[in-house]
């Protein structure tokens, strides 16, 4: 029987999944439940050593000989510090030493309790990864615990090995052993062992896609030149797979998956026909929160394609596979993914394979139809005078224009509107999603670019970053489309916030400020629009104005 502590059981299960066969264990009460599990699982050989300093070196010696990750398990407090000499040696010898340290709950650190000290950073300089496990009480916390253990063991064994620390807080009572079986835990797996993309990796990834009945490819934010300045790859990929890509993703067009996912969320009876069973994730963050939430709920196994596999993220809470591929190789990888349809000799032509292909085709056609419906809806819908109407008209005008325009969208409402109407690449500070610095980033971009650069920005973001104009550097190729609805309008979309009496003044930051004075003091041409006609004339002027000074169009709306 195993411990009733869920974090200990998750840890034990994953140690087995990652091939740990030896653990050096030290005496102590706080780590006793961990030692019990290691011994009880029947696969890990436990070697009892009393002195923690010696024990850590014992574990390093085992790892040197077996070339496998090896655990040293210690109790809380100074016992962990005693492993430092061996950890430092393992760091410089590149040995996968797994330090598992029991700990008091976080709330009792530095509270004059026995055998306590801040443990997670105690070995910081000499471990590649240090994690402190939660004591899970919800499914999200279970996922977090699983993810942390996976991240630590991945870091310990990734290419050139290194020591790691797994800190395990344990709440009393400590010694209840009534769990019959360890949980079956999800493990991250590298599909490649080399830094460069290999044929073997591609074949394994192709096989995963070929076995899937409902494969999905998600493309998050990417650099503008990720595909060699070509949008061919994503467009071609969309002929064979369902692809979720935004204007920040180098897609070259708007794929209206956010609206489609919201529709499926509102009609859950439709969702099973559209739910993926394997997802490939490329790039960074998605703007669409609704899509992230929906994909996490589907729990379809996912593969992350990343240039930084050591710091692999799990955005869909279902990571199974990791593939190393930098931006330079993405243009090579994309055709290889749909190559499975043109080289069927790689696979057996049995009945199961044909059924899978039939299911994939049906899944693809269903999504094409749904995405087409929402694309037609977006094209046909004529919003009343509002920020949406402004962005739709702006995007229509630059699409019809022969002028080369780089568009920079600020966060919040602006970039979400871009995801509805922009059929080109969009720059946005989406890494942290902050409202500060969007205008400064666009202005800096314009200094080293000869084309027109337009920053579409909301009022709070603009006034927060108005010092972007407080210099003599910016020139006539910077244009600003300011969407001023006198508040942080995006907060009005949050459910139930309107019930709070402070929603407008304290949260939404209602104001009556305009940009006219800011423009006057910073030598920026100023245009104002208060209705549909003025807005359309203003956008035309914004894009066609000739001069050496920046131009700002401030569009006042109620929504």
What are these regions (language model features)?
Residues 21-24, 45-47, 65-104, 275-283, ...:
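A short, small-residue-rich loop immediately preceding and capping a beta-strand
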Residues 148-151, 155-211:
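Conformationally flexible catalytic loops at phosphate/diphosphate-handling active centers
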Residues 1-2, 294-413, 514-518, 524, ...:
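Phosphate/pyrophosphate-binding active-site segments
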Residues 100, 107-120, 420-559:
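Thiamine diphosphate
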Residues 3-73, 78-88:
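N-terminal cofactor/phosphate-binding cores enriched in small/glycine residues
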Residues 82, 219-303, 307, 312, ...:
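Glycine-rich, anion-gripping cofactor-binding loops and their flanking helix/strand elements
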Residues 101-152, 245-366, 472-473, 480, ...:
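Glycine-rich, acidic loop regions that bind phosphate or pyrophosphate groups
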């Amino acid at each position: 029987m195993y411990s009733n502590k869920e974090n200990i059981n998750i840890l034990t299960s994953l140690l087995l999944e990652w091939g740990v066969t030896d653990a050096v264990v030290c005496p102590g009460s706080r780590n006793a439940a961990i030692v019990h599990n290691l011994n009880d699982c029947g696969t890990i050989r436990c070697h009892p050593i009393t002195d923690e300093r010696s024990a850590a070196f014992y574990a390093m010696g085992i790892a040197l000989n077996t070339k496998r990750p090896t655990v040293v398990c210690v109790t809380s407090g100074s016992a962990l510090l005693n492993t430092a000499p061996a950890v430092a040696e393992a760091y410089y010898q590149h040995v996968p030493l797994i330090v598992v340290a029991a700990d008091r709950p976080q709330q009792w650190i530095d509270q004059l309790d026995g055998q306590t000290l801040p443990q997670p950073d105690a070995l910081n300089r000499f471990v590649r990864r240090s994690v402190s496990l939660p004591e899970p009480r919800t499914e999200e916390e279970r996922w977090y615990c699983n993810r942390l253990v996976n991240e630590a063991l991945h870091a310990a064994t990734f290419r050139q090995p290194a020591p790691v620390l797994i800190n395990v807080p344990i709440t009393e009572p400590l010694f209840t052993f009534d769990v019959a079986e360890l949980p079956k835990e999800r493990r991250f797996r590298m599909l490649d062992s080399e830094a460069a993309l290999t044929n073997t990796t591609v074949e394994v990834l192709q096989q995963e896609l070929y076995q899937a009945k409902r494969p999905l490819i998600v493309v998050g934010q990417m650099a503008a030149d990720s595909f060699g300045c070509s949008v061919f790859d994503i467009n071609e990929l969309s002929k064979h797979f369902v692809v979720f890509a935004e204007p920040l993703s180098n897609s070259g067009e708007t794929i209206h998956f956010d609206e489609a996912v919201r529709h499926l969320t509102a009609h859950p009876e439709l969702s099973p026909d559209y739910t993926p069973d394997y997802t490939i994730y490329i790039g960074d963050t998605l703007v669409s929160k609704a899509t992230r939430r929906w994909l996490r709920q589907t729990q379809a196994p996912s593969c992350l394609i990343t240039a930084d596999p050591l710091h692999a993220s799990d955005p869909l809470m279902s990571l199974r596979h990791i593939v190393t591929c930098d931006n330079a190789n993405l243009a090579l990888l994309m055709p290889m993914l749909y190559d499975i349809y043109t080289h069927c000799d790689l696979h057996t032509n049995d009945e199961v394979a044909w059924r899978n292909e039939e299911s994939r085709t049906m899944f693809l056609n269903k999504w094409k139809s749904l995405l087409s419906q929402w694309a037609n809806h977006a094209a046909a819908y004529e919003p009343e005078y509002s920020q949406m109407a402004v962005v739709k008209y702006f995007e229509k005008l630059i699409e019809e224009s022969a002028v080369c325009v780089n568009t920079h969208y600020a966060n919040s409402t602006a970039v979400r509107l871009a995801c509805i109407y922009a059929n080109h690449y969009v720059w946005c500070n989406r890494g942290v999603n902050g409202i500060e610095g969007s205008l400064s980033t666009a202005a800096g971009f314009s200094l080293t670019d000869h084309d027109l650069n337009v920053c579409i920005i909301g009022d709070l973001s603009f006034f927060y970053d108005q010092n972007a104009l407080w210099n003599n550097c910016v020139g006539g190729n910077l244009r600003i489309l300011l969407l001023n609805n006198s508040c942080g309008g995006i907060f009005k979309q949050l459910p139930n916030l309107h019930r709070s009496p402070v929603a407008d003044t304290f949260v939404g930051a209602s104001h009556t400020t305009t940009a006219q004075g800011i423009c006057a003091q910073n030598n920026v041409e100023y245009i104002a629009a208060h209705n549909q006609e003025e807005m359309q004339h203003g956008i035309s002027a914004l894009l066609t104005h000739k001069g050496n000074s920046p131009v700002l169009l401030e569009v006042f709306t109620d929504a």
